[in-house]
Amino acid sequence: MLRGCGEVGAVDCSPEQLNKHLKMVPGGRKHSGKSGKPPLIDQPKKAFDFEKEDKDLSGSEEDAVDEKTQVFDKHGKKRSAGIIEDVGGEVQNMLEKFGADINKALLAKKKRIEMYTKASFKASNQKIEQIWKTQQEEIQKLNNEYSQQFLSVLQQWELDMQKFEEQGEKLTNLFRQQQKIFQQTRIVQSQRMKAIKQLHEQFIKSLEDVEKNNDNLFTGTQSELKKEMAMLQKKVMMETQQQEMANVRKSLQSMLF
């Protein structure tokens, strides 16, 4: 009966059913003992029947023999009831010990799950913080780089404007030359504007690339975390099954041996 405990479709292994089953065992042994050897109660009766042929046996002696047989029956019943109670108590103690072992295993499993979960969350938080720091460093680097480029372009533009003013003052009498220089300056300004526009577009594109890379990193980290959690769950389930099988083996060995 105990070998099927915990399996699907197995018999009920509750303490009440086990006590009921074990209480039935001494009765069966007592019955088999009766089949191999005649009970002691019948022996006095047979002796009494054998001696009954003596016609000198008095009525008081017959009463004494009957009282002895009744006392023997009472002691036999009390002894068998005591054996049943002792076996039931031992089984109850074994069941309580088995339940205590299961509770200890469950507590140990709970502690391991909490420890693995805390370690996984700590590792994931560290990865996220590292990604965030990397993103901030890249953004700061881009800001510094393009800020310097913008500043150099603006400084160059200011220098060009200063040259244009100087040339305008010097070439007031030379309209054609001034007109040519103006046209050249406009071309230069348009080129500078194009350069600024290109730098701005490159800056926006770089920011988008950084965001895409960070999204990919977050996605990869999330998938790795899911894989780690799945492996952790599988590992915990395997350890739990092994621990439960070991507890069941110990309990069965202690009950059988």
UniProtKB/Swiss-Prot annotation:
Keyword DNA-binding: yes
Tissue: Detected in spermatocytes and testis (at protein level). Testis-specific.
Residues in coiled coil: 87-244
Sequence segments annotated as region (Important for oligomerization and fiber formation): 90-95, 252-257
Keywords tagged on the record: Cell cycle, Cell division, Centromere, Chromosome, Coiled coil, DNA-binding, Meiosis, Nucleus, Phosphoprotein
Gene Ontology process terms (BP): cell division; cellular response to leukemia inhibitory factor; chiasma assembly; female meiosis chromosome segregation; female meiosis sister chromatid cohesion; homologous chromosome pairing at meiosis; lateral element assembly; meiotic cell cycle
A GO MF label: DNA binding
Modified sites of kind Phosphothreonine: T221
Post-translational modification as stated in the protein's UniProt record: Phosphorylated.
Nuclear localization signal (motif): residue ranges: 109-112
Pfam family, one: Cor1
One CC-aspect GO term: condensed chromosome, centromeric region
Localisation: Nucleus; Chromosome; Chromosome, Centromere
Sites bearing Phosphoserine, chain numbering: S14, S58, S60, S80
Top-level taxon: Eukaryota
Skewed-composition ranges (Basic and acidic residues): 43-58
Segments of this protein annotated with the region Disordered: 23-66
Biased composition regions of type Basic residues, renumbered to the chain: 23-34
Domain notes: Composed of a long central coiled coil domain. The N-terminal and C-terminal regions interact with DNA.
Assembly and binders: Component of the lateral elements of synaptonemal complexes. Homotetramer; the tetrameric helix bundles assemble end to end into long homopolimeric fibers (in vitro). Homooligomer that assembles into fibers; the fibers exhibit a transversal striation with a periodicity of about 20 nm (in vitro). Interacts with SYCP2. Forms a complex with EWSR1, PRDM9, REC8 and SYCP1; complex formation is dependent of phosphorylated form of REC8 and requires PRDM9 bound to hotspot DNA; EWSR1 joins PRDM9 with the chromosomal axis through REC8.
General function of this protein: Component of the synaptonemal complexes (SCS), formed between homologous chromosomes during meiotic prophase. Required for centromere pairing during meiosis in male germ cells. Required for normal meiosis during spermatogenesis and male fertility. Plays a lesser role in female fertility. Required for efficient phosphorylation of HORMAD1 and HORMAD2.
Family statement drawn from the similarity comment of this UniProt entry: Belongs to the XLR/SYCP3 family.
The protein's name in its UniProt record: Synaptonemal complex protein 3
